[in-house]
C-alpha cells in the first residue's frame, strides 16, 4: 500500500501568484506545509529599477536542478514510499495535489471535468496577469487595456470567460451542490478559480468597473450571481480559514515588477516605501 505524505515543501516567490492555489490545497488537507519564500530584489540598470531573482536562481535552484532538470517556481518537494520527489510547474503541482489529496473527482467523468475546469481557470487568470505585468506609456493606455480585460473576462456572452463558469454552475445536475465546480466535493479547480476571482475582485474595485459594490456582492452586480455565491461560500470554508488567517493570504497577488497587484502601500510596488518582510519560510501545521 502506498504511504501518505506527511509534509510538503512548496517553493515560490513572496507573492500569491501561481503558488497560491497549491498552498491552499495543502493547508486545506491538513498536511504540514513548509512554504519556502524567494524574493526578487531591486537593482538599478540603465537608470531604471529592475528586479532580479538571485535568491532563487543562485541558491536552491542549483541543487534542485540536480533532482529535476525542469525545476522552476513553484515546485513541490516531498517524500513518498521512502523516495524523494521534486516536481515543478503550477498545473502539474495542482493536478498532482488534487489526485494525491482526493481533490480531483470521484470517477473518470469528474476527473475529466477537473482537467477542463483547471485549464479554463488558468485561461481566466492569464487575461488579468498579462495586464498586471504590462507597463503602459500613459494612464490612458492603461485604462484602455483595463477595459479590454474587463470585456474579455466579464462580457456576458459566448466570448466572455467568466460566463463559462456561471453557465457551468447553472447547468450542474440539480442533485449536486453548486458550492463546488465538480460533483459534491472540493477539487483543484475550485482553489484556482477562487484565487483568480480574488485577484479580479481587486481589479474590479481599483478600476471601479462595478458601481456601489461591496466585497460580498461585486461579482453578483457584475452579472454573475452563481460565481458570486461560489466565491462567498469558498472563502468561508472552515478548513480554509487557517490559510485565510495566515501570512500567505496577506502576500501581494503579483511580483514586484508588476504594475498591478504588487504593492503593499498601493496597487504597485514602490521600492522607496515598500519593504518585503516576508520570512524565508512560513510553516503551517
State what each model feature region is.
Residues 2-152, 269-285:
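GST-like domain detector, emphasizing the conserved glutathione-binding G-site
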Residues 35, 243-244:
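Intrinsically disordered, low-complexity regions enriched in proline, serine, glycine
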Residues 98, 196-197, 244, 265:
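Active-site-flanking alpha-helical
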Residues 109, 116-236:
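GST-like fold's C-terminal all-alpha helical module
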Residues 212-220, 226, 244-262:
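C-terminal/domain-terminus segments
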Residues 247-285:
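Acidic/histidine-enriched, glycine/proline-rich intrinsically disordered or flexible terminal extensions
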Amino acid at each position: 500500500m502506498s504511504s501518505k505524505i506527511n509534509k510538503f515543501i512548496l517553493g515560490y516567490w513572496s507573492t500569491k501568484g501561481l503558488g497560491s492555489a497549491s498552498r491552499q490545497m495543502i493547508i486545506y488537507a491538513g498536511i504540514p506545509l513548509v512554504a519556502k519564500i524567494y524574493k526578487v530584489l531591486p537593482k538599478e540598470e540603465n537608470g531604471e529599477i529592475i528586479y532580479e531573482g538571485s535568491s532563487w536562481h543562485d541558491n536552491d535552484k542549483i541543487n534542485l536542478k540536480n533532482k529535476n532538470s525542469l525545476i522552476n517556481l513553484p515546485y513541490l518537494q516531498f517524500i513518498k514510499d521512502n523516495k524523494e520527489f521534486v516536481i515543478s510547474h503550477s498545473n502539474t503541482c495542482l493536478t498532482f495535489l488534487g489526485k494525491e489529496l482526493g481533490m480531483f473527482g470521484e470517477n473518470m467523468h469528474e476527473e475529466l471535468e477537473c482537467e477542463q475546469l483547471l485549464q479554463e481557470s488558468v485561461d481566466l487568470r492569464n487575461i488579468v496577469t498579462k495586464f498586471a505585468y504590462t507597463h503602459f506609456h500613459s494612464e490612458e493606455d492603461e485604462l484602455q487595456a483595463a477595459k479590454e480585460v474587463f470585456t474579455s473576462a466579464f462580457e456576458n456572452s459566448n466570448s466572455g470567460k467568466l460566463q463559462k463558469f456561471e453557465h457551468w454552475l447553472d447547468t450542474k445536475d440539480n442533485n449536486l451542490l453548486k458550492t463546488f465546480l465538480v460533483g459534491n466535493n472540493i477539487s483543484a479547480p475550485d482553489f484556482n478559480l477562487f484565487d483568480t476571482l480574488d485577484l479580479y475582485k481587486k481589479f474590479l474595485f481599483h478600476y471601479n468597473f462595478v458601481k456601489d459594490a461591496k466585497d460580498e456582492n461585486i461579482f453578483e452586480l457584475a452579472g454573475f450571481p452563481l460565481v458570486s455565491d461560489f466565491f462567498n461560500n469558498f472563502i468561508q470554508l472552515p478548513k480554509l480559514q487557517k490559510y485565510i488567517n495566515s501570512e500567505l493570504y496577506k502576500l501581494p497577488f503579483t511580483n514586484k515588477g508588476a504594475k498591478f497587484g504588487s504593492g503593499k502601500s498601493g496597487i504597485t510596488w514602490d521600492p522607496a516605501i515598500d519593504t518585503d518582510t516576508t520570512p524565508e519560510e512560513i510553516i503551517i501545521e
